[in-house]
């Protein structure tokens, strides 16, 4: 149990009456549990202030920094989104240049919009056998930085949504040789570096700014995250200023207690929990090697443990079909589905039953595929079109993100959008990585493939299904 939760619980048992916010006054309101109300307070005496920490919150952030090997750490209650916005805003001047992976989260693009940045993209290589993208390599970074003009900062995602880990140590050396900072969105790697058998985290590898979603892979509440800073390439006062802007002025003590509790669990039980987690996961992978149709991304030196990538390409099925079968027949809710695979996440929060159910279900599905029970939706519909990943395309940039997003726009049929300028982000969600960014020219391949994704029931944001498929574009003059 974390120190902040203990203090909140003890306070709730006193006779002090709250003549202050929040409005529920620690009383039962509707059907929410009383326990939540009891510890949901504001910045009252004795509980510090996240925006000017001096006591318990300062101490907890210092403990987080020691745990991750950072010089300074900040609690975030607005998720990693807040951390990414603050990191990019602090590292890159308004109107500056950012070199970033095309696979960046939409919050990175939002930062570029807000700060009117010019973006240069790094395009990850496709792992063809598994239909997923690898992490950005040091060679790609070196090649990009050899060109002029040199950006003001580099922004990477590691691990990727699918668990691919970049060689941050080498990349940091290359980036720093140019005198610029490295920002790593490590939202999916809050567990890294915390136990034997896990890869190092990016703080330990020399990154200047690192963002962790504590809730993604550790036992914390949704929306809780951390931002770490190292070295002298980042103005700390400037970083704090942007955190004040992007972070709520009424930070949730429930969420902060959750961060503290999760990190306390790691400190007290992490060795045992992570060892058990790795044993269970590897045992599951061994059993799943019996599958003849489904395949799984193997654990190599650059693959994060816990991300089970269920590849359905060889079976002739879409990732969405496997996702739907697991949900509807076996009541197993996965993280996401993509055209050629789906993703199940495992953490120290999973017991042996979670591994058994997933193993049994996938082995049964694999047997059903062999027996011809499942057929691809394309074959069912009489469609046999070759699919291309839209992330492989390098759309022509016709306007900056800020220009396009602020321009007058209109909604038109997707089939009529070829050659037009995208007026909004279009992405598969999750994870929210854009296939089209405002200001980019829409190609015929975009229109055709987006329509295919929608027919496969993939969650495409930025294209509506009202009165046929429609997309937002910049209005012609």
Language-model-derived ranges and their functions:
Residues 116, 121, 455-466:
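Short, compositionally biased
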Residues 286-441, 448-462:
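Conserved C-terminal alpha-helix-loop-beta "cap" of PLP-dependent enzymes
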Residues 75, 121-123, 212, 336, ...:
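Structural signal for conserved beta-strand scaffold positions within catalytic alpha/beta enzyme cores
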Residues 47, 74-76, 154-157, 309, ...:
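Short glycine-rich or small-residue beta-strand-to-loop segments that form or flank ligand, phosphate
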Residues 1-36, 427, 431, 463-464, ...:
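N-terminal glycine-rich, Lys/His-bearing helix-loop that initiates the first secondary-structure elements
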Residues 4-11, 31-33, 70, 80-297:
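Conserved PLP-enzyme active-site core in the AAT-like
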Residues 37-79:
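Conserved N-terminal alpha-helix of the aminotransferase class I/II PLP-enzyme fold
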């Amino acid at each position: 149990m974390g120190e902040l939760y203990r203090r909140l619980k003890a306070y709730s048992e006193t006779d002090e009456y709250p003549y202050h916010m929040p409005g529920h006054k620690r009383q039962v309101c509707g059907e929410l549990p009383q326990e939540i109300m009891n510890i949901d307070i504001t910045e009252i005496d004795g509980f510090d202030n996240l925006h000017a920490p001096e006591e318990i919150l300062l101490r907890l952030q210092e403990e987080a920094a020691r745990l991750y090997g950072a010089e300074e750490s900040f609690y975030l209650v607005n998720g990693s989104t807040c951390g990414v916005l603050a990191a990019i805003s602090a590292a890159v001047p308004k109107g500056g240049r950012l070199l970033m992976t095309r696979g960046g989260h939409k919050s990175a693009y939002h930062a570029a919009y807000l700060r009117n940045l010019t973006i240069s993209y790094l395009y990850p290589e496709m792992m063809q056998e598994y239909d997923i993208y690898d992490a950005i390599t040091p060679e790609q970074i070196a090649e990009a930085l050899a060109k002029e003009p040199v950006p003001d900062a580099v922004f990477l995602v590691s691990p990727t949504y699918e668990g691919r880990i970049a060689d941050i140590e080498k990349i940091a050396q290359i980036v720093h040789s140019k005198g610029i900072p490295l920002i790593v969105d490590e939202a999916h790697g809050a567990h890294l570096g915390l136990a034997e058998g896990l890869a190092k985290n990016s703080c330990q590898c020399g990154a200047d700014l690192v963002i962790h979603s504590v809730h993604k892979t550790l036992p914390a509440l949704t929306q809780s995250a951390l931002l770490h800073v190292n070295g002298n390439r980042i103005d700390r006062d400037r970083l704090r200023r942007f955190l004040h802007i992007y972070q709520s002025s009424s930070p949730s003590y429930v969420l902060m207690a959750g961060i503290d509790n999760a990190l306390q669990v790691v400190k007290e039980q992490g060795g045992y929990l992570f060892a058990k987690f790795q044993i269970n996961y590897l045992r599951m992978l061994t059993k799943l090697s019996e599958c003849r149709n489904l395949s799984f991304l193997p654990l190599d030196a650059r693959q994060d443990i816990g991300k089970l990538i269920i590849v359905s390409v060889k079976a002739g099925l879409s990732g969405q079909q496997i996702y739907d079968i697991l949900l509807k027949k076996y009541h197993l809710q996965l993280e996401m589905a993509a055209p050629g695979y789906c993703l199940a996440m495992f953490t120290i929060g999973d017991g042996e039953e979670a591994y058994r159910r997933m193993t049994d279900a996938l082995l049964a599905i694999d047997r059903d595929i062999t027996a011809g029970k499942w057929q691809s939706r394309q074959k069912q519909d009489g469609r046999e079109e070759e699919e291309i990943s839209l992330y492989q395309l390098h759309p022509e940039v016709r306007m900056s993100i800020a220009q396009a997003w602020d321009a007058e726009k209109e909604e038109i049929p997707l089939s009529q959008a070829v050659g037009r300028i995208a007026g909004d982000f279009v992405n598969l969600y999750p994870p929210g990585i854009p296939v089209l960014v405002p200001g980019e020219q829409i190609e015929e391949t975009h229109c055709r493939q987006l329509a295919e994704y929608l027919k496969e029931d993939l969650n495409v944001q930025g294209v509506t299904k009202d009165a046929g498929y429609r997309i937002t574009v910049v209005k012609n003059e």
